[in-house]
Amino acid sequence: ISPIAWQNDDLPELTKEYTMEQALQEAREIGYTGVERGQRMPHDTEGLKAYLENANIELCGGWCSGNSLVNNFPEECEAIGQQVDQFVELSSPCIVYAECSNTVQGEIQTPVNGRPKLTRDEISSYASKISEVAKWCADRGMPMAYHHHMGSIIETEDDVNWLMDASSSDLNLCFDTGHLLFGGGDVMATLDRWGDRINHVHYKDCLLYTSDAADDSLR
């Protein structure tokens, strides 16, 4: 489970009363044995390892802010290398990679419809780049789980399909039900199509009337 179930990283004021210690304790009480790395956890490897051991919980992944759209291959590997090595050290089953260059997800005043949109050919070109990075991660012992996300270049069902069609088998998918539904996608159709390449799942709900209202406000 991810600590964002307790703590909103984009709107921290909404959940400031929830401590990370409370989140981890309640996660264990519910029955979870692993959590993703959270922003309020130690970021150094030894500190994070001790922190999780003290909470009797393991690392099961965590967000990685990627910039493969604008970085070349060596630049991107250098940028994410420390986190990849940390996750290998802590035996995480994957790293949850999301493209953050030009994303609007953290810009509260910008509607998600203002996100950068790529053509199919542009996504195919991007898929070649991110496949290289995914292979590099896998060769170091850390499978990549690509997170499609509202406000980013890979948001809609078409975006996901185009990316997965054009990428290598080194690129796996972090299947996020809430983001896909909010983006207007067919959750079950996407699951059926790419199930064999899904290696991490975010089960989230979505208030459809909220997403409909957001769509209406952007027309």
Give the ranges of each region predicted by the language model:
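N-terminal pre-domain/capping segments
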Residues: I1-P93, D121, S128, A138-M142, ...
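Non-cysteine beta-strand/loop elements that form the S-adenosyl-L-methionine
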Residues: I1-S2, I95-A98, R197-L207
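Active-site beta-loop-alpha junctions enriched in small/polar residues
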Residues: I4-W6, G38-R40, C64-N67, C100-N102, ...
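Conserved protein kinase catalytic core
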Residues: D9, P42, I153, F182, ...
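Active-site acidic/histidine proton-transfer and metal-coordination neighborhood
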Residues: P74-F175, F182
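Histidine/acidic-residue-rich catalytic or RNA/ligand-binding cores of hydrolases
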Residues: T156, G184-M188, S211
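A short alpha/beta connector and helix-capping loop motif
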Residues: G185-Y203
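Conserved small/polar residues in nucleotide/adenosyl-binding loops
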Residues: Y209-D216
